[in-house]
Regions:
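A contiguous pocket-lining binding segment that forms or flanks enzyme active sites
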Residues: 132-171
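A common structural junction motif
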Residues: 124-131
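Conserved small/polar residues in nucleotide/adenosyl-binding loops
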Residues: 203-210
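Flexible glycine-rich active-site/ligand-binding loops centered on an Asp-His dyad
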Residues: 172-202
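Helix N-cap motif at beta-to-alpha junctions
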Residues: 112-115
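Charge-rich, low-complexity segments
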Residues: 1-99
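Short cationic amphipathic helices and targeting signals
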Residues: 104-110, 170
């Protein structure tokens, strides 16, 4: 093996930045994207805190917790690009903010059907929350049987130099509804699974039965 002198190694190191140099425009976009995603993450934290406070309050007042679990996610970059492309919208940060209401998402899993309407009503009444839209897929299920209560809300997030309203999609459902939705989603990507349609239909039926108790 031929060894290189220290001078040769030093010269090769100096040349590396020139080889992997990233365009300034791309770096600026990456920084802006990172900042916007941070803002959505903070908005999720605000919304989760609101539901956690309500859950604590109701556990004392009613001696039980109506909320079993709170999940959250920020949409992945590839999912954002695919959704904007599908809608025929430009792939820009401005387009994402204007056209997508579900970049930030919070899912609230409740014990019973009545809990969904109770906690959603309490959130809607908070004076710093703006309701953008509501879709009740419990009273009006989707064709595939999907049931859930969807809210697009706008919540203020306080940063060091400003107050920024941010949109968050909130999905509220029971444990049974969440299990069925999760199974249905998995089977969409597992078409070869024997008896897939039967499994979904059975789970959907059981979800309705459980929610009626």
């Amino acid at each position: 093996m031929q060894m290189r002198s220290n001078d040769e190694v030093d010269r090769s190191i100096v040349q590396v930045p020139e080889i992997v140099q990233v365009p300034k425009g791309m770096l600026a976009f990456a920084k802006q994207f990172q900042e916007v995603m941070m803002m959505y993450t903070c908005a999720i934290r605000e919304v989760k805190t609101k539901f956690e406070v309500l859950n604590d309050e109701l556990s004392v007042r009613n001696k039980r917790n109506p909320i079993e679990m709170i999940k959250s996610r920020v949409k992945k970059p590839m999912s954002i690009v695919e959704k904007l492309s599908k809608r025929g919208q430009p792939i820009t940060l401005e387009s994402m903010i204007s056209n997508l209401d579900d970049v930030a998402g919070v899912r609230v899993i409740c014990s019973f059907l009545d809990d969904i309407y109770e906690v959603s009503d309490m959130i809607a009444k908070q004076d710093d929350i703006k309701i953008i839209s509501i879709k009740d897929y419990i009273k009006n299920p989707k064709e595939n049987g999907y049931r859930s209560y969807h809210m697009i809300i706008e919540v203020p997030v306080f940063f060091s130099d400003r107050k920024q309203p941010m949109k968050v999609e909130v999905q509220i459902r029971t444990i049974a509804m969440d299990f069925w939705a999760s199974l249905d989603h998995q089977i969409k990507y597992k078409k070869e699974f024997p008896g897939a349609d039967i499994a979904v239909s059975y789970t959907h039926l059981r979800a309705h039965e459980t929610d009626s108790y």
